[in-house]
């Protein structure tokens, strides 16, 4: 009887221990791998097997921009939900959303004439990319863009400067 009581007490004490902390493997992920050269990988917010791939779209220069993003380019003409990675060919003519302040010029614009369209430079030194989250400041408008994604939904949050033009 004493042995049964001891075994019961030992089992009870064993059940009271804390579970081991789970390893956060997402800290090992670098979403920018393949965004330069001929990688054709987009940077943005997505999850494995998700229906949306939310990210920035740059002014395309050559076929290396077919994912919408290239590491060598800091232009942004908008943010969209359906980027493709590694395809080598342009995707589905994405509908883009571009947050702006001040007067609006309804055109894509060019790098040669910064006021010719909606685009902005992105401050890549402050760009944050991690699984399910993307953030970058748009220097032309003083806006911080933040994107996140779940399996079926992409969400945008824009932080505008305190201004009457915002």
Language-model segment annotations:
Residues 20-166:
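Accessory carbohydrate-recognition regions in carbohydrate-active enzymes
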Residues 1-9:
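Sec-dependent signal peptide recognition
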């Amino acid at each position: 009887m004493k042995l049964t009581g001891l075994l019961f007490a030992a089992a009870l004490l064993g059940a009271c221990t804390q579970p081991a902390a789970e390893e956060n493997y997402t800290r090992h992920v670098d979403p920018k791998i393949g965004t330069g050269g001929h990688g054709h990988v987009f940077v943005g917010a997505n999850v494995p097997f998700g229906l949306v791939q939310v990210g920035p779209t740059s002014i395309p220069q050559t076929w290396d921009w077919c994912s919408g993003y290239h590491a060598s380019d800091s232009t942004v003409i908008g943010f969209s939900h359906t980027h493709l990675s590694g395809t080598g060919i342009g995707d589905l003519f994405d509908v883009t959303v571009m947050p702006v302040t001040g007067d609006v010029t309804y055109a894509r614009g060019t790098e040669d004439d910064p006021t010719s369209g909606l685009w902005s430079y992105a401050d890549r030194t402050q760009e944050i990319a991690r699984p399910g989250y993307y953030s970058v400041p748009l220097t032309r408008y003083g806006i911080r863009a933040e994107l996140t994604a779940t399996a079926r939904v992409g969400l945008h949050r824009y932080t505008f400067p305190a201004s009457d033009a915002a």
